[in-house]
Amino acid sequence: VTDLPATLDLPTALVVLPGGKSAVADAGPARELRPPYARELIQEAPVLVAHAAMTARRLGLNAPGRSRRILDALELYAFVRPARFTAPSAAGLALALGLPEPRGVAAQAQALREVCRILLAELAATPWPSREEALVLAETLDRGGWSWGAAVIGALRSQPIKHSPRGSGLEVWSRIPEWEDQAPAGEPGSKPIDPEAAGRRLDELLQRAGLDEARASQKVFAAETAWAFQPREREGEPRMMLAEAGTGVGKTMGYLAPASLWAEANGPAVWVSTYTRALQRQIERESAGIFPDPAVRARKVVVRKGRENYLCLLNFQESVNAAQLGNGDLVGLGLTARWARASRDGDMTGGDFPAWLPSLFAVAPAVQASAGNLVDRRGECVHAGCVHYRACFIEKAVRGSKHADIVIANHALVMSQAAFDGARTARGLKGDNETTSLRRIVFDEGHHLFDAADSAFSAALSGAESAELRRWIRGPEGRGRRGRGLEARLMEIVGDREAARDALQDAIHAAAALPGEGWSGRIAPPDGQVNPLGPIEAFLVAVIEQLRARAAPGDQGLEAAARPATDLVRDTAALAAAALARVEAPLLALARHLEDLLDEETDELPTSDRARIEGALRGLDRRARMTLPGWRSMLKAIEEDAEDDPDFVDWFDATFLYGRVVDAACRRHWVDPTEPLTAAVIAPAHGILVTSATLADSTLDDPFALAEMRTGAARLPERPQTLRLQSPFDYAANTRAFVVTDVGKDDPRQVAAAMRELFLAAGGGGLGLFTAIRRLKAVHERIAAPLADKGLALYAQHVDPLEVGALVDIFRAEEDSCLLGTDAVRDGVDVPGRSLRLLVFDRMPWPRPDILHKARRQRFGGKGYDDGLARARLAQAFGRLIRRADDKGVFVMLDAAAPTRLFSGLPEGVELQRVGLVEAIEATAAFLARG
């Protein structure tokens, strides 16, 4: 590493592990430090840390504000290596720079200094013109109080500067390449795919990726799934296939082989839909086998997400302007500018944006440089009316997806887009111009289709949702708030069309009846003195009153059936429905005026104006033709105290925060969401492949019966094709599974002690899964310090100030760390190797018996339905343990009452043993020690 100038001397490095164990490193050897001295150091002295907020929290302190005293190595990494991955810890940084994993707190403190020296030396070697670009931004951030300012400027000025930099460096929108329009790609073709050619393509892909030749099961998978890419025979009857491929078969490459052949012959495009971000990233990586050239791959493989995932350059510019006037996080925005310049696609919620960046210091949530403030969550986009339209990340992704061979998306986007297109088609309009026809779809992680459809095809009238609608129509009404209402977005478009202007003003006036600023404090104040403004808030107050009268308090809030409703709920529902009708009518009128404008002036409209109108119509359609009618339908049923519709479940619930109600909602879900899923997504498609490692259920006479019901396949005229391939892994040799029979699952002390000793027996690498947040926190409180004393770091969802993806990144990077999470975490954990070698459930993951689940259990088979869901959850969790042929893992259930029949979904060769805790601990230690 290049020696640094004396002016760049680093302060003392401080690392604090979960549990409070601390160490410091300066010019001499690293040494451990007692917590009181560590607290004094971070509060008073210059100090170098990795994640200031998490470091302070482990010492029992609040997150510090920005200070020139506290240098966070993660900020330096974000500046020097923007849009490049690191786990947000000292060990994670060391691994990201190619250093060996530092084990133990003292080694991590020493490594932290070395990491910063390497990064500053790397910065000193930055070539022109990147050096000038970095320098101008660093000088701006230094004036804004950035603790790394002097060190970064010193490194950049260690070599001559060719040109004097100009500007602030924050104007990233002026340096992002613009997109270019292309001719329409046309509709996809229907040429068949040869199964043998799919096998040959698989061999090519594996060879390009530098992998071994295909396993026999992988070749079978590629050839058999080609069936879903053949031409369909009849309208409304897609070629649908359910394919279970056990872990290790290689299903991703297996379906990319026929998908890429089909796209070459017929495209665009095959849509590959996933449930988790981790799998999206994996598919994108594996697509390198199809298109080795990065430039070609960028055109041919596009990750497509909803607008609410991408950095909005206009929001960013407005935030920068505010921060330069003293109202914002200038440093955070500067680091975000560095990221945006380097980002592959501007995705802030699962792409290359460091999600840990906004949480490093105590910054008010409203001004953080976070996705919540910088993406277009509120549908406020002005489309071609935006000065950054040609550089827009969202527009770039939209256009890219129209011409790509493979579009990688998520279940939510595919379903919402299909539902929207279906609604437009039903009115005789063309589909959304943002998306190509969804002719061929691969649903990976297909076991989540039911849950994704449940979310996509539901309705919720809540304080937050209705307040968001008010803001979308009227714009921000508080002081200093950013945003754009309908008037700002549309007045220029409607021009002198008096009827359209009147409709716009009527909508703005009617929206005043929706909840406004401070609504939560009025409907559920801490002192109980409610003061609702308007009919929607009055309805929500009545809902909360009914909930308190009828609901049993639970861990996650209150819920009660919507009907029979109290007199107050019925009366306020009628008034709320009338208010919503007054909002809906002018929005519909405005939509019709805009449709007329497109029709009547089609030969005169500039392309930019057409894009603005079509964008406005998308927002109006979703709200005036989908959301508002859904809300009014729910309210009408409540007002009339109607008989329950057998296809729907209506209920009320309340949201709690810090122990008190902050919102209430009226919800409507389909009992069977595969009905709209089939109508909107599956039936219009030509070919559907649903795949997962856990689709079938061996305990059923027909192993795919439950999967057919939960994917919509059972609703098609013809049964789907099915394929089932076993995992090639040797589970009998590489796994152990225990049910512990002598731990009281309802005693937090016993559960904590059991989990602690199991984690110690494994030497770390343990994942603890809980079915309730309360129990997770209770266990964490009891075991974090004892594990830290033994050198094992314990991270926890809902405890550490990081989103779960960042926690999983740390868990993956630090081989001997442990992680606690809710049962839902199992879906996002893709951790091969020794980092995950022990998985412990606190109790059986039964489905929560809420109102919605009770209705489904009655519809779908009672106890057998519950068993099927629990069995699948166990199988999915077990599948996290073994990701490669040489992995070893232990599965432990701490619920003695767990029925043996539910473990029948575990892979062939796994033997379930019911043992006492001591025996489980000894067996875990002995088995993993052999690996």
Predicted segment positions?
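A substrate-engagement module of RecA-like helicase motors
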Residues: 192-203, 268-269, 274-405, 412, ...
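Conserved helicase motor "Helicase C" RecA-like lobe of SF1/SF2 P-loop NTPases
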Residues: 773-798
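A contiguous, basic/glycine-rich beta-loop/short-helix subdomain that forms a polymer-engagement track
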Residues: 371-402, 418-429, 596-741, 747-749, ...
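Walker A/P-loop
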Residues: 234-258
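Acidic, Mg2+-coordinating catalytic module of metal-dependent nucleases/exonucleases
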Residues: 89-159, 891
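Conserved pre-motif I regulatory segment
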Residues: 190-243
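Conserved RecA-like P-loop NTPase helicase motor core
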Residues: 728-746, 799-899
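Conserved DEDDh/DEDDy metal-dependent 3′-5′ exonuclease domain
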Residues: 11-123
